[in-house]
Amino acid sequence: MKIRPLHDRVIVKRKEVEAKSAGGIVLTGSAAGKSTRGEILAVGNGRIMENGEVKPLDVKVGDIVIFNDGYGVKSEKIDNEDVLIMSESDILAIVEA
């Protein structure tokens, strides 16, 4: 996939969530709900500050993140793959191993 986000935007591939019901049945897909975790596929150059300087992003390609799946998150299909385009500010945390 060749895509380069601009400024403070990132491209995220949502990670599938596996959930279990109270009875122990594994729920997948829409029954499990949408995951708010994903892997960073691409990052922009950084946030342009008021003084014109560019502040590099805190996330990098390959990071697993927890994000806010809100109004500013755009869903796109690129090369038959569902991805999310969001600002770095929509990312709440980086999951560290």
From Swiss-Prot:
An example Gene Ontology biological process: chaperone cofactor-dependent protein refolding
One GO CC term, this protein: cytoplasm
CDD domains associated with the record: cpn10 (cd00320)
Sorted UniProt keywords: Chaperone, Cytoplasm
Tagged with keyword Transcription regulation: no
InterPro entries to which the protein is assigned, alphabetical: Chaperonin_GroES, Chaperonin_GroES_sf, Chaprnonin_Cpn10_CS, GroES-like_sf
Keyword Nucleotide-binding attributed: no
GO molecular function list: ATP binding; metal ion binding; protein folding chaperone; protein-folding chaperone binding; unfolded protein binding
Primary localisation category: cytoplasm
Highest taxon above the source species: Bacteria
Record Pfam families: Cpn10
Location within or outside the cell: Cytoplasm
PANTHER family assigned: 10 KDA HEAT SHOCK PROTEIN (PTHR10772), CO-CHAPERONIN GROES (PTHR10772:SF58)
Entry function: Together with the chaperonin GroEL, plays an essential role in assisting protein folding. The GroEL-GroES system forms a nano-cage that allows encapsulation of the non-native substrate proteins and provides a physical environment optimized to promote and accelerate protein folding. GroES binds to the apical surface of the GroEL ring, thereby capping the opening of the GroEL channel.
Homology family: Belongs to the GroES chaperonin family.
Quaternary structure note: Heptamer of 7 subunits arranged in a ring. Interacts with the chaperonin GroEL.
Protein name per its UniProtKB record: Co-chaperonin GroES
Taxonomic lineage of the native organism: Bacteria, Pseudomonadati, Pseudomonadota, Gammaproteobacteria, Enterobacterales
Annotated gene: groES
